């Protein structure tokens, strides 16, 4: 803990320095710098407050132990012992809370996300499962007070999704749903199966942070834009203007097609939003940063084809293969009650990161 306390003292010193800087007229007049320093101070506030509380509790423990060593009457000794016990429990609790606050922050945690769900192996059944996953995430988002905007979808004849893309807006969406990328496997009896046999199908989920203040700038020369007429079921043209848009990022070969919006301009805006997110995600996947290494040691490789979870309908069981978690409440999870799964993934990653922090 000594190294952690050294770091905490440095953070407290910086917090006090920020307080002085934010009172400086020159800083106040510089809106950009003032905003940046205010955010830095706000980010440090909880950690510094916990550290100060920790120091108070540690001092109280020392004072109580000194009082007991001086000799007290039975009634007073009983009160001090109770106070000492409570203080020691609070100290342990504060230590764990402080460790979590000191863990490296994912810079994307506060961001909204773009999610893409695709039916994979399994034909019609895979597309139906993709629709079930969309329903599950939609209900979970509603439980969190988030909003969902469907920006593209390809509906199959059986009412499933060949693919669907959506934006989920809200408080810290990425921090909760970043673990969902990968292959999701379902085991169940399809409605079309007359013999009652269990079939296995898969759907893939890709989760990307929405890049509003885009850290990646796309050179217009690297983007080819094609426009065409939107098509309905069976390829029938549903309007007479070229409102559909296809964008190709030439360096990566990433293609985004958008036709669900009412105008070409709206389709352009949505296509560019998804293209930026996909290109950002593509390059992020290429980087061998320290953060990526931590992710791989924690909740999986991040490989889009990695099987991360199995949904077994006959046994009402959901298994997350990355952390060995099995829950016999598939019905509730598919109804949006994802908290137990996501909380377990967050805890697992925090535990791994904490072990690394303590060993540094």
UniProtKB/Swiss-Prot annotation:
Post-translational changes noted in the entry: Methylated by PrmC. Methylation increases the termination efficiency of RF1.
Modified residues (N5-methylglutamine): 236
InterPro entries the record matches: PCRF, Pep_chain_release_fac_I, Pep_chain_release_fac_I_sf, Prokaryotic/Mito_RF, RF-1
GO (cellular component) term, any one: cytoplasm
Keywords: Cytoplasm, Methylation, Protein biosynthesis
Annotated compartments: Cytoplasm
GO molecular function term, any single one: translation release factor activity, codon specific
Function comment: Peptide chain release factor 1 directs the termination of translation in response to the peptide chain termination codons UAG and UAA.
Cross-referenced NCBIfam families: prfA, PRK00591.1
Similarity field: Belongs to the prokaryotic/mitochondrial release factor family.
Protein name: Peptide chain release factor 1
Organism of provenance: Ligilactobacillus salivarius (strain UCC118) (Lactobacillus salivarius)
